[in-house]
Amino acid sequence: MSKQDSLWFKSLRWLQRQLVHTVVVPHDPFDDLNLDPSKPLAYVMKTESVSDIAALSEMTAKLGLPSPYEELEVNGVKAPRVVCLEGSKPLFGQREGGEQYIDCFKRLLSVHKQNRELDIQLVPVSLYWGRTPGKEDDTMRAAVLERQNPTWLRKCLMILFLGRHNFVQFSNAVSLRYMADEHGTDKRIAQKLARVARVHFQRQRKVMTGPQLPKRQALFHALLKSDSITKAIKEEAASKKITEAEARAKAMEYLDEVAADYSDSLVRIAERFLTWLWNKLYKGINIKGAEQVRQLHHDGHEIVYVPCHRSHMDYLLLSYILYYQGMVPPHIAAGINLNFWPAGPAFRRGGAFFIRRSFGGNKLYTAVFREYLDQLFTKGYSVEYFTEGGRSRTGRLLAPKTGMLAMTLNSVLRGVERPVTLVPVYLGYDHVMEVATYHKELSGKKKKKESVWQVFGAIRKLGNFGQGYVNFGEPITLHNFLNEQAPSWREDIAKDPDQKPSWLTPVVNTLANRVMTNINDAAAVSSVTLTSMVLLASEQNALERSQLEKQLDLYLTILKEQPYTEYTSVPEGTGHDLVSQGLELKKLQIESDPLGDIISIDQSIAITMTYYRNNIIHLMVLPSLIAACLLRKENCSREDVICVVNDFYPLLEAELFMGIDDPAQYASQILDIFVAQGLVVEAEHFEVVESKINQLLLLSGTISETMQRYAILFNLLEVKPNMERSELEKDSHRLAQRLGALHGITAPEFYDKKLYATLSVKLKELGYLADNQGCSDIKRIKERANLLLRSSVRQTIVDSVHAEQNT
């Protein structure tokens, strides 16, 4: 009888099964790690442990992977399925010695010499009982509570108290065929393989648990001794005519206000609450791109998460997802408005550090905050902050605030040794709990002061909120970014470390825009966002169900056949499936009659639904522009369409943070899809297929309000070519309000003053404002914008502009 079949062993495994709850990282190793089920597979683990292998066995059975208890047999040669680098540790004395693992590696490698077709996949597996990183300078406690190399007694206690927090992590497989072909099969290669595995396990533990935590007061005293804070204390004392001791006490108060107080115990409690909460609120959370972030952590990068900001739930969602993806929740920069009892202390122990909305010229506070942020980077803690500065009320990305990005870039310039990498994150929801409040605020109601009831009050109305979406975008490594934007940055800083380089501000602005673009590049399309887009483009926010489903199928085809970026996610299924999901979420209404179902958006929430449409409007705005061009312009050729796209893309890029490298090529590929879908026929020019005209009309409706804005701007510029930016912003906003009142435009962003400010900056940059060279293009672009509008809207704009000129 084998050991694992003995009654004692079965009893031990049964007991462990009752005590242990295991989370697998990643959740689907076959897909996420590209494991090949047709090839043999072996596991390598750091330490030999009965409980670890039992936990691994439970997971392999669920995942359909080979059991660690089954011997690996290839060509008559038997080898253990699991190779352990260290023996078990006895209660007293030293760990068992020997190099049995070297023999195992040699046997696994040698069979490849005999069979040229063989390729064994060696998969590193790490197990964690709890994820406490430990404290700095806590030698006695570390000796008593040793987690990395526990005795069997210590392991029993760990299972008893931390069994519900067991993580099994699979890593990318090593091809032993590649190792044998490239390096040979002798003992030296086996030893090298073992060394690489040890380094891997050491790095993997740091990714899972994070660096050791500092003692808070010791950290404060160390920071107060830094050169920058010492200098700021002296300046504060001199300027405020107080003693240095008083200035130091004030600096200590600032540190206490700012600094996080991370607690692994609280994170474990929060994890249970959040698991309950997500299961109650959402049917699932869709994640894309987590593996690339895990790899960055493993490669030693300092990670800064820069997500978009939709809801207060963002703070919780991203930390929760990272925890379950085998990474440490980041230290989160939270607005000081969230530092209220009891939420503030809880957020602080969950990793939040607090930042004032404005530093207000307070040099001491600025020095304290910067030094604290530097310390986080130096120690290796991941950080998270929202570059928008606040939650978007319209569903579009807000213009970025550059303060935190500038401080992060300054930390790199000051010599952070590890590569610092920004990871843009797109967060999306089928239902944002605060969305009704946002529209009240946009309509003029005063924003309520933050309170625990405002943040969590919606939990009392728990319902079906659909799904959440977390997509990780293209990372930006700051050292590489600086090399690209300012190749001589190292020399410039070395010459005069205290002098702010002249290139820094424009580089920060470029970085901010790239972050926002990369967030939008990782957008998640959902049933709610896509059905909102279609229905809001219809005249009465209503369509026959068959027509709606057909339109959704067209959009899905465009998004899948011409992916916006590799980071964008598009739902599986058909238009019928998306409509069914929207009805289930009660975002849509259905009315039935003998002629068929009619799907609509309730007029009372139509404005609210613009929020969800705006989340992904950038994905469909160019197809919409192309559809409008095909419908409005007679004898429209491919060249005509590309010229229109080239005229308007720079404004769309600035307004919607778009990142299409070659708009002309993209437009041509969209036209190819239109032809393939039978929407148009192409000869010398395009001819719209009459039976498909409604599909093009609906598609063109998505950009209609955007084109109305552009028509207002260019009509104003034509009649007042010497307008200053401020005058253009004021006049265009006033005309937008008039147009909205006359034509029933309710989308909140249509009246957003900040949006017109963004566009005016871009117009100046493009040379369309006074004293620039692009004035000759204004008439052409105005005519193209006017052409793409309905005649009634076009006439209102023309009449209003001339009335404005005559006042």
From Swiss-Prot:
It comes from Shewanella pealeana (strain ATCC 700345 / ANG-SQ1). Pathway: Phospholipid metabolism; CDP-diacylglycerol biosynthesis; CDP-diacylglycerol from sn-glycerol 3-phosphate: step 1/3. SUPFAM superfamilies: Glycerol-3-phosphate (1)-acyltransferase. It is a peripheral membrane protein. This is Glycerol-3-phosphate acyltransferase. A motif (HXXXXD motif) lies at residues 308-313. It is found in: Cell inner membrane. It comes from the Bacteria. CDD domains: LPLAT_DHAPAT-like (cd07993). Belongs to the GPAT/DAPAT family. The HXXXXD motif is essential for acyltransferase activity and may constitute the binding site for the phosphate moiety of the glycerol-3-phosphate.
